[in-house]
Amino acid sequence: MSDETTTTDRAIISVLGADRSGIVAAVAGLLAEQDVNILDISQTILQGMFTMTTLVDLGGADIATIHDGLAALSEKLGVQITIQREDVFKFMYRL
């Protein structure tokens, strides 16, 4: 990650749903198609429920286009997928 990356260039993608194969590959593939770089990824499976949180560098990618792609992927995989800019995410979840 370059020092020039700001929080407005980054976003948090969250995935929640029943565990199944291919979720990580599908999300990563969509991001790669949009030239979005994964900076950090965390995933957990609790009692059959899959959760994943991913920090990405949007670079010059259009967040609305990524949102639309993730929405279609969410429906296809049967999981919930959300994307928020990092600064909005931090504001909403501050303690």
Identify the residue ranges that each predicted region occupies:
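A conserved regulatory-domain signal marking ACT and ACT-like small-molecule sensing domains
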Residues: M1-L95
